[in-house]
């Protein structure tokens, strides 16, 4: 099912967030994906973080309008996600649980319309947390709100509101989050029609502490297989990333970060290799 309409609430401001944070890693990570003759996709991921190693194996199988995803890791956790498309017209039903924590289960229903979208999630436990979000808009303009309510305490766990604008050459968003305590303004501007070069900025202000965080960044696609990204915030943290498609669908990512205001501290480096058929 192709998503239509203004998208979910979580999509507002996502372009800026992804450009500033997606694919940056400071660990060593290897991901190998394969597809069996029966159509089952298998993905093994090994991560070295400091002196610790973790490993997880996930399998994905799609049958008609149903998608099953099961992941097992070295901590003996089993995560299962069942996604059913078009249970009702223009809907998506997602059920997830992470064992052995039976209370982690959640059921979410998403509905997509040409001018609106809604999502409701309910925890699978007595007195669960109920979450709701809605977005409405047209012609690249979207308004959204979300809230979470704990039925055990009778209190709201969160409430947020946002407005987003999406045009061919730019994306902008204003988000009021953390129960009204955080204001986040972000924008992405594409410098050319093919979106080979983009710049991004994000300003976050926490009202309770009068704390401001400004992050700027950019993306440049050297060629169809190679891209570089960089970001810098007002605290002096500078990060850069190089991503290269070594063969179709297989990507090597090298990233690093250092504190320009504390050059005596060692920089962080990360390497990730994703191999796909």
From Swiss-Prot:
Function, as annotated: Forms a channel through the mitochondrial outer membrane that allows diffusion of small hydrophilic molecules. The channel adopts an open conformation at low or zero membrane potential and a closed conformation at potentials above 30-40 mV. The open state has a weak anion selectivity whereas the closed state is cation-selective.
UniProt-listed PROSITE patterns: EUKARYOTIC_PORIN
Keywords: Ion transport, Membrane, Mitochondrion, Mitochondrion outer membrane, Porin, Transmembrane, Transmembrane beta strand, Transport
Entry comment, domain topic: Consists mainly of membrane-spanning sided beta-sheets.
Organism of derivation: Oryza sativa subsp. japonica
GO cellular component, one term: mitochondrial outer membrane
Subcellular localization(s) per the UniProt record: Mitochondrion outer membrane
UniProt signal peptide: none
GO terms, molecular function: porin activity; voltage-gated monoatomic anion channel activity
Major place of residence: mitochondrion
Gene this protein is translated from: VDAC5
Domain of life from the UniProt record: Eukaryota
Similarity comment text for this entry: Belongs to the eukaryotic mitochondrial porin (TC 1.B.8.1) family.
InterPro entries hit by this protein: Porin_dom_sf (IPR023614), Porin_Euk (IPR001925), Porin_Euk/Tom40 (IPR027246)
Database matches in CDD domains: Porin3_VDAC (cd07306)
Record-given protein name: Mitochondrial outer membrane protein porin 5
Intrachain S-S bonds: none
């Amino acid at each position: 099912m192709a998503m239509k309409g203004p998208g979910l609430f979580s999509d507002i401001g996502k372009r800026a967030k992804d450009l500033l944070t997606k694919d940056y890693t400071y660990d060593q990570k290897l991901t190998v994906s394969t597809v069996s003759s029966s159509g089952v996709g298998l993905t093994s991921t090994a991560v070295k973080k400091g002196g610790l190693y973790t490993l997880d194996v996930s399998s994905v199988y799609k049958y008609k309008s149903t998608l099953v995803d099961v992941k097992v890791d070295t901590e003996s956790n089993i995560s299962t996600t069942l996604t059913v498309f078009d249970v009702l017209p223009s809907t998506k039903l997602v059920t997830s649980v992470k064992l052995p924590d039976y209370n982690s289960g959640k059921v979410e229903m998403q509905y997509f319309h040409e001018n609106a979208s809604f999502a409701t999630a309910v925890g699978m436990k007595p007195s669960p947390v109920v979450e709701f979000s809605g977005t409405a808009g047209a012609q690249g303009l979207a308004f959204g709100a979300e809230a979470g309510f704990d039925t055990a305490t009778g209190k709201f766990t969160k409430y947020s509101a946002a407005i987003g604008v999406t045009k061919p050459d730019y994306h902008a968003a204003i988000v009021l989050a953390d129960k009204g305590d955080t204001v986040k303004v972000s924008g992405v501007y594409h410098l050319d029609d093919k979106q080979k070069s983009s710049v991004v900025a994000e300003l976050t202000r926490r009202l309770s502490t009068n704390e401001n965080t400004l992050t700027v960044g950019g993306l440049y696609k050297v060629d169809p297989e190679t891209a570089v990204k960089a970001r810098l915030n007002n605290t002096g943290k500078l990060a850069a990333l190089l991503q290269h498609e070594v063969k179709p669908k297989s990507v090597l990512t090298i990233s690093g970060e250092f504190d320009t205001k504390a050059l005596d501290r060692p920089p962080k480096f990360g390497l990730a290799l994703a191999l796909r058929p």
